[in-house]
Curated annotation (Swiss-Prot):
Residues in coiled coil: none
Any one annotated GO CC term: ribonucleoprotein complex
Gene (UniProt): rplW
Binding partners and assembly: Part of the 50S ribosomal subunit. Contacts protein L29, and trigger factor when it is bound to the ribosome.
Native species: Thermosynechococcus vestitus (strain NIES-2133 / IAM M-273 / BP-1)
Name of the molecule in the record: Large ribosomal subunit protein uL23
A Pfam family hit: Ribosomal_L23
Amino acid sequence: MTKVQPRALADLIKRPIITEKATVLLENNQYTFDVDRRATKPQIKAAIEELFNVKVTAVNTYHLPPKERRVGRFVGRRPRYKRAIVTLAPDSKIVLFPEV
């Protein structure tokens, strides 16, 4: 695996995904994130472990297709993006919703 600077690792993870499917996966200790399209599975694993101080057991990724958007009579496309489903060790947990 290539060495990546810690700041570059933080830039790989764009945002957590909170959808119905993602909340069902939370029960299995799996978290879903939007990631940079060029990020590899080892880089995503290193970034999650560095940012959240957890132990990652598996990383699954998939590409979502571009979405068409219409502005008046012009049709454009939103860019493609990549999602990662990260499985954590049973004793690890990421707090997405801090207690108030």
